[in-house]
From Swiss-Prot:
Entry's Gene Ontology BP terms: iron-sulfur cluster assembly
Stated name of the protein: Chaperone protein HscA homolog
Keywords, ordered alphabetically: ATP-binding, Chaperone, Nucleotide-binding
Family: Belongs to the heat shock protein 70 family.
InterPro entries: ATPase_NBD, Heat_shock_70_CS, HscA_NBD, HSP70_C_sf, HSP70_peptide-bd_sf, Hsp_70_fam, ISC_FeS_clus_asmbl_HscA
PANTHER family, sorted: HEAT SHOCK PROTEIN 70KDA (PTHR19375)
A Gene Ontology molecular function term of the record: ATP-dependent protein folding chaperone
Keyword Transport: no
Function per UniProt: Chaperone involved in the maturation of iron-sulfur cluster-containing proteins. Has a low intrinsic ATPase activity which is markedly stimulated by HscB. Involved in the maturation of IscU.
Pfam families per the UniProt record, alphabetical: HSP70 (PF00012)
């Protein structure tokens, strides 16, 4: 098979020139950056030998600081010290205020409802704050490697949605970084242990960080990681261990709850030091606020046992969601500094029936996996391993209504890979769907290459939008594409296999990519027009069905107004004025609101007919 370089046609790197890449673990509490040097992945330290960078930024009028310096200002200047910004990524202001009502920041909403944080440096959004953390990590890597980075792999939680992932990409772009790939954190941890090239089967990744707990159940098949289930607790982490132990020491030392900040800081520092020491020792001596006493590992275990049990309950739920039993799990990977606690390792081992993998520093394992992946994607592997560099040369997708192409797997995605997307029916009672597989970078079907067609039949006859079809694209290591369409409620499915790159030369691929750039603006306008025409057709189809069923609910005058609005929409939909079509759709919606309300009332009355209030 032809081996395809990641670089753009005509811009290939010199054959023996090593490119600089890094893996970044952008964490809630701490972040790290790692790279591969002399064949070994390692995290990079600052000038004081510290590998972790606190995910904290302190803003002032004159500038900002990131990391340890910023963290010291958390208690002194709370409003201008932003921490745990990862929790805010990709969320609306309303969502943030509902989820995290006790945040000490002053927020404003942007025009599109996104959060803006009031600081001494002005209004800042979570993307900007994340970008400042990424810049600090990139600067550390640039200095250590003595050169600018050619690309980075950034890790994200497996449960991150599209908005959160896009926010992370935007932050990287703002930081001046080229993102080779966003990699799921549990997948990165598995890669660090080499599980991506080992035995196929189910892998559990137990991630207990400072502020959150995540459990991910993965299935490895032919080098492809599939996330079967995720779970956890966003309000449970190692910080809770610290607070329980601090409360116990406070009680033993008779320290008032509301003593001054200096004593509270001293108490917390002593608590954290004791927790760390108890990972190796059976007991530790604690000195705080003039009090000295012994804390045993057994006492600490009793305090945290209920919290550890909560994590195992989340593991049980995730296994149930994944449809697998604990004894089916081949390996358990430990991630997060709090997994150093002996009780955690012991209970996790008992739960899964096997000792967890702990040989790699749990704080560093995700960053190390990201660095390994970045080294592959940037093109540093020798020829004997070049297969890992094979990529999809052109985007793969599907034809949707209006002759549009919906991309499912973007070009330059490394293979093997699997991606899925959900689609729905366009017409009432639709029982079949034609699946048209496309290849190319343009927005319209007429400008892309047709790869294959097949039909999915046996879809239940439901109203438009009622049936949900999941279409899965899977490309194996040989570049063979399998497309499967499955109706979710019935399980009925159909599939086809095709070789996407068959028959295309490198020059043809380059030409298709060049065309996509040359016609980008024109294509976007064409797509917007096609989308509005599809929406107009959907609105008219729905309206005609409603009128056929319930026209008696309208007076002659009301019917005339609706008919006029529909006729106008039908007329402008034949043209190419996007704004006119959009306004005509809004007008139909406005003129039919009362009609829709009457239809709803009539449906409710029919449903309740013959039933008493008590029955309802």
């Amino acid at each position: 098979m032809a081996l395809l370089q990641i670089s753009e046609p005509g811009l290939s790197a010199a054959p023996h020139q090593r490119r600089l890449a890094a893996g970044i673990d952008l964490g809630t509490t701490n972040s790290l950056v790692a790279t591969v040097r002399s064949g070994q992945a390692e995290t990079l330290a600052d000038h004081e030998g510290r590998h972790l960078l606190p995910s904290v930024v302190h803003y002032q009028q004159q500038g900002h600081s990131v990391g340890y310096d910023a963290r010291t200002n958390a208690a002194l200047d709370t409003a201008n010290t932003i921490s745990s910004v990862k929790r805010l990524m990709g969320r609306s202001l309303a969502d943030i205020q509902q989820r995290y009502p006790h945040l000490p920041y002053q927020f404003q909403a942007s025009e599109n409802g996104l959060p803006m944080i009031e600081t001494a440096a002005g209004l800042l959004n979570p993307v900007r704050v994340s970008a400042d953390i990424l810049k600090a990590l990139a600067a550390r890597a640039t200095e250590a490697l003595a050169g600018e980075l050619d690309g980075v792999v950034i890790t994200v939680p497996a449960y991150f949605d599209d908005a959160q992932r896009q926010g992370t990409k935007d932050a990287a772009r703002l930081a001046g970084l080229h993102v080779l790939r966003l990699l799921n954190e549990p997948t990165a941890a598995a890669i660090a242990y080499g599980l991506d090239s080992g035995q196929e089967g189910v892998i559990a990744v137990y991630d207990l960080g400072g502020g959150t707990f995540d459990i991910s159940i993965l299935r490895l098949s032919r080098g492809v990681f599939e996330v079967l289930a995720t779970g956890g607790d966003s309000a449970l982490g190692g910080d809770d261990f610290d607070h329980l132990l601090a409360d116990y020491i406070r009680e033993q030392a008779d320290i008032p709850d509301r003593s001054d900040n200096r004593v509270q800081r001293e108490l917390l520092d002593a608590t954290i030091a004791a927790k760390i020491a108890l990972s190796d020792a059976d007991s530790v001596t604690v000195n705080v606020a003039g009090w000295q006493g012994e804390i045993s590992r057994e006492q600490f275990n009793e305090l945290i046992a209920p919290l550890v049990k909560r994590t195992l309950l989340a593991c049980r739920r995730a296994l149930k969601d994944a449809g697998v039993e604990a004894d089916e799990v081949l390996e358990v990977v430990m991630v997060g500094g709090s997994t150093r606690v002996p009780l955690v390792r012991e209970r996790v081992g008992e739960f899964f029936g096997r000792p967890p993998l702990t040989s790699i520093d749990p704080d560093k394992v995700v960053a190390i996996g990201a660095a390994i992946q970045a080294d592959i994607l940037v093109g540093n592997k020798p020829d004997s391993e070049m297969l890992l560099l094979d990529v999809i040369p052109l985007s793969l997708g599907l034809e949707t209504m209006g002759g549009l192409v919906e991309k499912v797997i973007p070009r330059n995605t490394t293979i093997p890979v699997a991606r899925a997307q959900d689609f729905t029916t366009f017409k009432d009672g639709q029982t079949a769907m034609s699946i048209h597989v496309m290849q190319g970078e343009r927005e319209l079907v007429q400008d892309c290459r047709s790869l294959a067609r097949f039909a999915l039949r046996g879809i239940p006859a439901l109203p438009a939008g009622g049936a949900h079809i999941r279409v899965t694209f899977q490309v194996d290591a040989d570049g063979l594409l399998s497309v499967t369409a499955m109706e979710k409620s019935t399980g009925v499915e159909a599939s086809i296999q095709v070789k996407p790159s068959y028959g295309l030369t490198d020059s043809e691929i380059a030409s298709m990519i060049k065309d996509s750039m040359s016609y980008a603006e024109q294509d976007v306008k064409a797509r917007m027009l096609a989308e509005q025409k599809v929406e107009a057709a959907r609105v008219l189809e729905s309206l005609h069905g409603a009128l056929a069923a319930d026209a008696a609910l309208l007076s002659a005058a009301e019917r005339q107004v609706i008919d006029n609005a529909a006729a106008h929409l039908s007329e402008v939909a034949q043209g190419d004025d996007v704004d006119a079509i959009e306004q005509a759709i809004k007008n139909v919606d406005k003129q039919t609101q009362d009609f829709a309300a009457r239809r709803m009332d009539q449906s409710v009355r029919r449903a309740l007919k013959g039933h008493s209030v008590d029955e309802v």
